[in-house]
C-alpha cells in the first residue's frame, strides 16, 4: 500500500479531517414527505439532527435565512455521515420523508467496508463516482506539504479538485429537483462539509451561518456508530482505507470526533471559503467556472430550495 517510503505515516495525519473527523432551532415549511399526515408528524420529530438509532450526523440543512429575506426550505436538503448502522426503525423513519436521492461522496474502499444498506433496500437513487481514497489522499498530501502549520488548509483546497466530479453530480441532481436528497461521506463533516457550504452559499446563506452549520458536526457525530464494528486489523490486509484508519486511530479515543478548527480556533472551512473568494470572487462564480452551472441554474436552485 505504501506509495513511497514513509509516505503513509506522514499523509495519514492529513486524512483526519476527511474521514472522521447544540441543536440549532429553526422554523420552516413542513417537510416534503409523500403522505401529509406523515409529513406533519415527522416535522415535529426533530429540529436539525434527525433522531436515528444508528445514524451519525444526519441532519437537515433547512431553516437558514438567505440574503433575499427567504429561508432554506426544510425537509429537502440533508447531510450525513456513513449510514451503515441505520436500523430497521431508522430506515422506516427515513422512508417517511420520501427521499429520492443519495449522493455518496465516499471512495470505493470506504463503501466496501461500510455499505449503505438503506440505499439497496429502499427505492432511492444512489449516486456516486468511483475513486480511490488512497490515491486522493496522496495528492492531498502533496498539496499539504507546501502549506504552513498542520496542512489542513492545503487539504481542504485540494478537496475542491478531488471531489469535483461528485460536486457536479450533486448539483445536477439538485437542479433536476431530485429531493429530498441526502449527501454523505464517512463522517459527514469534511467532504460533505465543503459540499454543503457551497450549496448554502449558492442559496444566499451568510458565511456566518455556513460556518455555524459546518461546526455542528463536532456535536452531531457518533464515531463509534460510524466505525460499524468492522475489524480494521483484518480489513487492512486488503483495504487501504482500513489501513489508514488503523494508523490514524492509534493512541486516540475512538469515541471522540476530530476537531474542525486549527490550533488557533479557526474553522478549516474558512480556508476553503477564503480560497474561493480569492480565486473566483464568489462561490457562485466558482460554481459557474468549475462546475458548469449557469446564472439561470443558480436562479433555479433558489426557486427550488428557498421559501
Locations of the language-model features?
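Intrinsic disorder/low-complexity detector
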Residues: 6, 25-27, 36
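Non-Sec secretion/translocation targeting segments of pathogen effectors
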Residues: 1, 18, 32-34
Amino acid at each position: 500500500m505504501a506509495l513511497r517510503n514513509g509516505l503513509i505515516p506522514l499523509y495519514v495525519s492529513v486524512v483526519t479531517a476527511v474521514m472522521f473527523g447544540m441543536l440549532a432551532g429553526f422554523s420552516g415549511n413542513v417537510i416534503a414527505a409523500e403522505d401529509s399526515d406523515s409529513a406533519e408528524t415527522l416535522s415535529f420529530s426533530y429540529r436539525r439532527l434527525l433522531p436515528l438509532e444508528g445514524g451519525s450526523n444526519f441532519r437537515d440543512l433547512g431553516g437558514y435565512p438567505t440574503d433575499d429575506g427567504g429561508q432554506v426550505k426544510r425537509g429537502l436538503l440533508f447531510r450525513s455521515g456513513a449510514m451503515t448502522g441505520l436500523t430497521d426503525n431508522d430506515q422506516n423513519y427515513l422512508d417517511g420523508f420520501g427521499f429520492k436521492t443519495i449522493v455518496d461522496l465516499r471512495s470505493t474502499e470506504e463503501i466496501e467496508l461500510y455499505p449503505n444498506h438503506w440505499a439497496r433496500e429502499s427505492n432511492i437513487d444512489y449516486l456516486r463516482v468511483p475513486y480511490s481514497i488512497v490515491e486522493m489522499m496522496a495528492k492531498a498530501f502533496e498539496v499539504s506539504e507546501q502549506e504552513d502549520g498542520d496542512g489542513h488548509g492545503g487539504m481542504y483546497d485540494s478537496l475542491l479538485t478531488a471531489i469535483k466530479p461528485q460536486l457536479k453530480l450533486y448539483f445536477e441532481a439538485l437542479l433536476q429537483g431530485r429531493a429530498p436528497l441526502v449527501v454523505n461521506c464517512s463522517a459527514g463533516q469534511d467532504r460533505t462539509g465543503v459540499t454543503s457550504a457551497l450549496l448554502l452559499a449558492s442559496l444566499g446563506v451568510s458565511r456566518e451561518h455556513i460556518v455555524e452549520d459546518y461546526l455542528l458536526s463536532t456535536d452531531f457525530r457518533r464515531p463509534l456508530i460510524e466505525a460499524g464494528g468492522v475489524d480494521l486489523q483484518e480489513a487492512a490486509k486488503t483495504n487501504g482505507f482500513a489501513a489508514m484508519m488503523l494508523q490514524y486511530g492509534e493512541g486516540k479515543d475512538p469515541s471522540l470526533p476530530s476537531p474542525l478548527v486549527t490550533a488557533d480556533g479557526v474553522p478549516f472551512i474558512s480556508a476553503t471559503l477564503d480560497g474561493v473568494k480569492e480565486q473566483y470572487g464568489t462561490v457562485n462564480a466558482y460554481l459557474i467556472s468549475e462546475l458548469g452551472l449557469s446564472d439561470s441554474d443558480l436562479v433555479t436552485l433558489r426557486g427550488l430550495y428557498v421559501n
